[in-house]
Amino acid sequence: SFSGAAMMSPTAKAGLYKVRITKGSEVFEKQIEVKYDPNSMITQAERDQQHKVTMELFDFIEELAYLVYQVDTWDKNVEEHVSSQPKPSKNTQALAAALDGLREKLVVTSGDNYVGAGEPRLREKLNDIYMVIGGYPGAPSSSQLETVQALKKEFQDHQKTWASLQSGELKKFTAELAKANRPPAVIKPKEVFLKES
């Protein structure tokens, strides 16, 4: 799922833009020009770097949201199957534990995400750096860029864990569902998920 930071879209670069407003059956269009402050000490190169990194982080947030969605969808499928079985298989139990473990590394799963929440997970750390870099028009600092790289590395590790689950326990679980004549989880394509989120 998306969080508050993902609702802050990257700022528009300087240039001409067409604005379209629809009110009932009426459509109003106007062209506007976005300009940078001519008195700003921030150079174009710094703005370009900020925009590039902000867009990378925005895409990163979408990738993470899609992974969390897949984990949640399969976890619900596992829970439904377990509730219909007198005794879940060892593989299903292992899969349930692995999905919960992966989710706990991706997002805060305790508290209300505002007060008394658990220690920040990948999503919360990513949101923080996105808000900081995206909220300042100048180039990110070297320490901020190091943080971004560390978060990317962490996400790659979680993606490897997910790929391993898909080819291992999840594949066996799907076969188990087929034997029980139960449908597997239906995962929306990423483009559909992002459009609906």
Language model: regions and residue ranges:
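Glycine-centered tight-turn motifs at strand-turn-strand junctions
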Residues: 1-8
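Low-complexity, Pro/Ser/Thr- and charge-rich linker/hinge segments at domain boundaries
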Residues: 29-63
